[in-house]
Amino acid sequence: MADIFDSFELLYDRPGEPMINTKGEDKVLFELTEQFLTPEYANNGLELNNRFGDEEEVSRKIILKNLDKIPEFPKAKQLPNDADFSLFLPSHQEMANEVIDVLMSVTENQLQELLSTCVYARINLNPQLFNYCYTVAIMHRRDTGKVRVQNYAEIFPAKFLDSQVFTQAREAAAVIPKTIPRTPIIIPRDYTATDLEEEHRLAYWREDLGINLHHWHWHLVYPFSASDEKIVAKDRRGELFFYMHQQIIARYNCERLCNSLKRVKKFSDWREPIPEAYYPKLDSLTSARGWPPRQAGMRWQDLKRPVDGLNVTIDDMERYRRNIEEAIATGNVILPDKSTKKLDIDMLGNMMEASVLSPNRDLYGSIHNNMHSFSAYMHDPEHRYLESFGVIADEATTMRDPFFYRVHAWVDDIFQSFKEAPHNVRPYSRSQLENPGVQVTSVAVESAGGQQNVLNTFWMQSDVNLSKGLDFSDRGPVYARFTHLNHRPFRYVIKANNTASARRTTVRIFIAPKTDERNLPWALSDQRKMFIEMDRFVVPLSAGENTITRQSTESSLTIPFEQTFRDLSIQGSDPRRSELAAFNYCGCGWPQHMLVPKGTVGGVAYQLFVMLSNYELDKIEQPDGRELSCVEASMFCGLKDKKYPDARPMGYPFDRPSNSATNIEDFSAMSNMGLQDIVIKLSDVTEPNPRNPPA
């Protein structure tokens, strides 16, 4: 049975090459029949497929089951193979729904039938559309849990790499035999702009491979578009949309302060010119065109693009905004039958990122998704010039654009206005915050050979194998070498006294800058939005004194380093292989190498906040007793087929204003909380990743 799961994984290989070719480094051939051939290969496809099969190097042949009923895909086939795909476009959403429906409808455990259906879809559909729908189906079917989702950056490297790289990569693949180690292609750190553009100071963060993979993978686990409501309607999905993006904005603002920039300015006047320009320096290998740039001073314009299913005006958007603001002000939403329902944070999230879960899409619109579309089509709002969308409309590239953060700063402000309205959310009472009998006596961070309460960051170069995405080039690994931020591993040391009997407690760890842009102490009303959650975990407390230690690499926020920079094809004997197989669901976690903000060479003052909360108020009764498929990254990603593993509101205790404390010192005075000044210090050196393949 293992072979069939390997066969499914081969459908990710070289998405632009036809299926008549061999797949994978081992040259595996799918034996096609006439029903799988597209019109351009109708005359000679079987002959070519057989010719590949006669090659001595073919290691294995996969015989496909003929389908009794061939899927039609009337909508999805309308997307040309060389077009780019975006979930923000209504017409593309309909196409994706159609394909996902077909792949999900194959009878469970009929894996040969499913494989043939997927091969047919792979051959007949746009490669980006297929990859998205295929991955969503693989993640959500119960019989494909052993199929490993492949690293998107390895399959579509053009979404992550300077376009100049691919000429060098193909030359290396063609000239240097795969048996000889190939010198990695160096990706310069400053390839999209210079520091004359102040926003470019954040390019290392916005264009980080792991951060962009996180965003792409999160939206695979939590798709907003699917006909089957079960795929969308996961536990607390709307609230998680709020919290994950709120933490992205908080982390981005932390990085801005480290780079002497103000916090990001929300985009609230939708008719003003946009000063932020962005030139992505990316080419789409699917469409063989460059991604459209955005010049400084451009504005939103009414969208009239029938080909994309877009017909929406700025007036429409402003009306939707007023309706959402009214729902927040009254605490109620109006349903399609004119009745009302009490608004909560989960419902608001499903209104902002409109999906089948939106309570009234006609009234509240699709604001978040349309904000991406308006921002992506400023250069061609009427399809007059046949231009495609900008990077902000692709889940894998959207976080590269500085304007993404202005859009999401406004989105977060809407959620914060809900949290700050007492008729919607009441401030926490003392009993909701305290943990009777538990006293935190000290908190600290320690790293091997380093100063106590100092976190150390540095630059690292890591390699990614591009060969799976280099269509029509010779086989063998071709590596691109990225420079990215990293930090020295550290651990938290928390000392606590428990005057009651043995019990469990949830440890919640946050950090935030100690001062604002003007180097002044924060008001809690502002600093609470700057706290970034570093870890959350449950531990037993024995009676009396306790010392809790936790390694930074154990964080429930992050995915291991290997899941961002990994090549599954060489992991066969790796003892981590069982962990890597869990990438399908947990892969949407925050990248471990970006856990700590950059800091500065001189050191930036931060505050470490630790809370030991009352586990009796935290715990969740899961619907069944099945073992978890993975434990990492549950903070942003939840748990597969289970409830979110924390009963508290996401972001607790900083998700809402305090009715008594005005600063963090006052707020953290409760016995079950601890506060410690720490420093984040950057060592401005670049080190090679010891995991890189030998050159």
From Swiss-Prot:
SUPFAM superfamilies, alphabetized: Di-copper centre-containing domain (SSF48056), E set domains (SSF81296), Hemocyanin, N-terminal domain (SSF48050)
Domain of life: Eukaryota
Protein's UniProt keywords contain Secreted: yes
EC id: 1.14.18.1
Catalytic activity annotation: 2 L-dopa + O2 = 2 L-dopaquinone + 2 H2O; L-tyrosine + O2 = L-dopaquinone + H2O
Claim: Magnesium is one of the keywords in the record: no
Enzyme class: oxidoreductase
Positions bound to Cu cation B: H368, H372, H408
One GO term describing the cellular component: extracellular region
One Gene Ontology MF term: chloride ion binding
Primary location group: secreted
Matches recorded under InterPro entries: Di-copper_centre_dom_sf, Hemocyanin/hexamerin, Hemocyanin/hexamerin_mid_dom, Hemocyanin_C, Hemocyanin_C_sf, Hemocyanin_N, Hemocyanin_N_sf, Ig_E-set
Positions of Cu cation A binding: H215, H219, H245
Cofactor(s) this protein requires: Cu(2+)
A Pfam match: Hemocyanin_M
Places the protein is found: Secreted
Keyword entries, A-Z: Copper, Disulfide bond, Melanin biosynthesis, Metal-binding, Monooxygenase, Oxidoreductase, Secreted
Description of activity control: Activated by immulectin and lipopolysaccharide.
Note accompanying the cofactor annotation: Binds 2 copper ions per subunit.
Residues annotated as the enzyme's active site: E353
PTM notes: The N-terminus is blocked.
Assigned protein family: Belongs to the tyrosinase family.
Function according to Swiss-Prot or TrEMBL: This is a copper-containing oxidase that functions in the formation of pigments such as melanins and other polyphenolic compounds. Catalyzes the rate-limiting conversions of tyrosine to DOPA, DOPA to DOPA-quinone and possibly 5,6 dihydroxyindole to indole-5'6 quinone. Binds to the surface of hemocytes and is involved in hemocyte melanization.
Quaternary structure and interacting proteins, as annotated: Heterodimer. Forms a complex with an interleukin 1-like protein as a consequence of a host defense response.
Protein name: Phenoloxidase subunit 2
Underlying gene: ppo
